[in-house]
Amino acid sequence: MADKGCEAAQSKDSSAPGSGEPRPKTEKELERERQKAAKLEKYHAKLAAKKAKEEARKPKLDKKAKIASPVAEYVEKTTPGEKKVLQDLDSPALKSYNPKAVESAWYDWWVKSGFFEPEFGPDGKPKKEGVFVITSPPPNVTGALHIGHALTIAIQDSLARWNRMLGKTVLFLGGFDHAGLSTQSVVEKKLWYTQKKTRHDYPRDKFVDIVWEWKEEYHNRIKNQMSRLGGSFDWTREAFTMDENLSRAVVETFVRLHEENIIYRANRLVNWCTALQTTLSNLEVENVDVPGRTLLKVPGYDEPVEVGVLTSIAYAVEGSDERIVIATTRPETLLGDTAVAVHPQDPRYKHLHGKFVKHPFCNRSIPIICDDIIVDMEFGTGAVKITPAHDPNDYEVGKRHNLEFINIFTDDGLLNENCGEFAGMKRFTARVKVVERLKELGLFVGTKENPMVIPLCGKTSDIIEPVMKPQWWVNQKEMAAAAAEVVKSGEIEIAPDMSRREFIRWMENIQDWCISRQLWWGHRIPAYFVNLADEPSQDRSEGRYWVTGRTLEQAEEKAKAAFPGKSFTLEQDEDVLDTWFSSGLWPFSTLGWPKDTSDYENFYPTTLMETGWDILFFWIARMVMLGLKLTGKIPFKRVFCHALVRDAQGRKMSKSLGNVVDPIDVIEGISLQALHDKLLVGNLDSREVEKAKKGQRLSYPKGIPQCGTDALRFTLCSLTTGGRDLNLDILRVEGYRKFCNKLYNATKFALGRLGSNFVPNKTADLTGNESLVEKWIFHRLNIAAAAMNKNMEEMNFLQATSAVHQFWLYELCDVYIENSKYLLSDGTEVQQESAKQTLYTVLDNALRLMHPFMPYVTEEMWQRLPRRPGDKTQTIVKAAFPVERVDYSNEIAAKYYESIITVVHSTRSMMAENGIKSDAVVYIHPDEEHSKLITSESASIQSLIKKCKTLSIVDNTFDSDKCVKNEVLEGSTIFLERNN
């Protein structure tokens, strides 16, 4: 695609160059010729590559390998926070593109100067150009950022910078999430790994202090990474989910929703992680398919645990010799069985309706019940064991038939006092022992492989146990219906459409949300149990004896009203809230809600929420529901869900695979050995470290080269297509680093040609002295500007990056700069001045076009360009973004010049095909239609061909015996003199 962006006015020139105007080619004809020339050039390039490969295979005779000179060390001379002191581009460290040198010092100056803070109009209100607000997804304070965070920042920051350059009032608000479960999990792992201690070895307040210390360390580390990535966050508004105001918002939300009976307390089946000893929401559970008998590594067990096996056992029917055979994948749960269910219409069991079976281990009788919902007569034996306290389906059966709910597990995964001889055993040890005892009793029938789904904790990989626990819940039904409606109506746009459809489907099938967690790190639930002095036995599982309050005093007033005249004490719930509860308030709590602040007035609803599709339900859904419920407004107008980053082979990034990419390693470069060394700092055990090292050797055999921030950002944006996955190949990042070098050197060349005394015109308007190539480059700049703005608005990052890359590489560098060389050296004084002014204008605009994706190199080179008289713009951050200009559009001149490019490409292809690498002798016999054009632009053609010794225009009497020839433009002929 072409690039876009410019700001100048130029009179349209519809006349053809030279006299006797030739008929301009139609776009269709030109495109056909371009395709033909491009195919030919590609074919010859392929041949040349093949030849080079063959040459490379030949043995080298006594040739020493060329060793690249090391880059000189760059020493920054700028005082931190001050405007960068620009060093000479001819100094050793700056002779070629050096990311370290280019990226140094700019960010601190941008922040200190307030360039990232919202700019308001003279009246203190947002500017008339509009408002753009992103409250960026807060990274967890669990460790360093990974490449997925880099993708998020690259996309969001490109949009923030683009909108800022359009003159809008922009707020790009960043912050951090306390991430209760994730952070506590990683801190506990660290304590165990380094000291063999758990949180229970500390008083709660001491453990929380340890987590705060972790938070401070990683908060600072992550903030530095976010800055290194160029994120133009307004750090004066930085937020943390446990800040005072955000904590106030959490309390307000909980109390308000509890008062409306949307939040309630109930004893229900929950997902229990024995490793963390906390409940998890369904979204925090990873359901893993196993094809059959499988061994899984489970926390707390030295040996792998067997899953994917169906065990058949027999229950003896009381008062007879009959047996009922049932099957289970969890034999240990036999100890919690309180019924055996059969289908009421199953003739095999009709005579057993109302009978009992004898429990083999516990001294109790178990009823045989009829249930046509859970039992399928055609499956297995047609009999099903019912364990209401430990299975979601059985839980419903238990409620329907008023069965006893017997819990068999302790919080840490041992069998409890209800399990007789198995009490105190680990649950999976008990699984084996139960089967052994059944064999001894003659009740074991057999086993077979069974494909199944195993629920695992997303943090610990522990196997989840469904258990009965009193918890706090959110009834989401009405909120979800409202959320679905604003998306269906288009009030909130969600892209891509797949994510929109998934959002609506999820909202229409919403379940209640368990929001309490048995953790110590997080927002403690503002609910208080009312201990009544005259009622020693009170039920804590339901909500009757619980009150909530924004303060302890408010809770006391509620307790007095609920229990008038009673003596009581209040005891605050020790549980904390699910992290996503506070995260769901992010778009408005960060702006001051529940207070009515100026930020809330100016910036809410926000403009865009951009994040990975994987947290659509975790986060986006909850922000929409809570935003509508609490503020009466949508939290944002648009949602864009980007892909998940995978490695070059398409694998999920995982520490144990050794393919996790730290963006700083890509920016700075890192050796393979240093990558290995980093593995030793984490919580991986020795086996996992060796596996990860193997993965690193596969993915990064030579380490990761230094690529710089700009190349990384550009790569990530260029790979963003709206798909589900994004495969990142470090070689591609390295390729865009070379593109940065091209941009850097092109600007260096331009600065050299402009000279130190060059003064740009007061405006970017055309002068009327422009040559054909200048008219063409302005036209292409116009197309690039239009394409860039259109695609950024549509968040089509693939096309936006393609547009600016196309313009820089193939139009500005490969064509205009090459073509302008002869104008700058051999043209008349008027031609030289015009070429310089055009070079300046186009380069200035091209740098601005690239700035949203590559902030550092564009600022570095833009600051070296002179400013127009009267232009006081301090930084490219605040420079006007190029927009389409009618006066730069020149279709006729563009078509003429495309004909010139076609001739050039065809000639280059002929040279490649005939092995002519330099001193080419070229003759062109133009047809009548193109004669004036080719003759007048012969110098341009020769300049663009490169390695062309002479170029002559000939007529039909030319003796071509010594030449190869090729027809172009449907009538013109190129002759290339053969090598002797």
Curated annotation (Swiss-Prot):
Record's keyword annotation contains S-adenosyl-L-methionine: no
Keywords: Aminoacyl-tRNA synthetase, ATP-binding, Cytoplasm, Ligase, Nucleotide-binding, Protein biosynthesis
Catalytic reaction annotation: tRNA(Val) + L-valine + ATP = L-valyl-tRNA(Val) + AMP + diphosphate
BP GO terms, sorted: cytoplasmic translation; cytosolic valyl-tRNA aminoacylation; valyl-tRNA aminoacylation
Record-listed E.C. numbers: 6.1.1.9
Intracellular or extracellular location(s): Cytoplasm
Main location (coarse class): cytoplasm
InterPro entries: aa-tRNA-synth_I_CS (IPR001412), aa-tRNA-synth_Ia (IPR002300), Anticodon_Ia_Val (IPR033705), M/V/L/I-tRNA-synth_anticd-bd (IPR013155), Rossmann-like_a/b/a_fold (IPR014729), tRNAsynth_Ia_anticodon-bd (IPR009080), Val/Leu/Ile-tRNA-synth_edit (IPR009008), Valyl-tRNA_ligase (IPR002303)
Record's compositionally biased regions (Basic and acidic residues): 22-40
Pfam family, one: tRNA-synt_1
Cysteine disulfide partners in this protein: none
Binding positions (ATP): 655
Gene Ontology cellular component terms for the protein in this record: cytoplasm; cytosol
Domain of life: Eukaryota
Motif range ('HIGH' region): 139-149
Motif residue range(s): 'KMSKS' region: 652-656
GO molecular function, one term: ATP binding
Span list, region Disordered: 1-40
Similarity remark: Belongs to the class-I aminoacyl-tRNA synthetase family.
Protein name, entry field: Valine--tRNA ligase
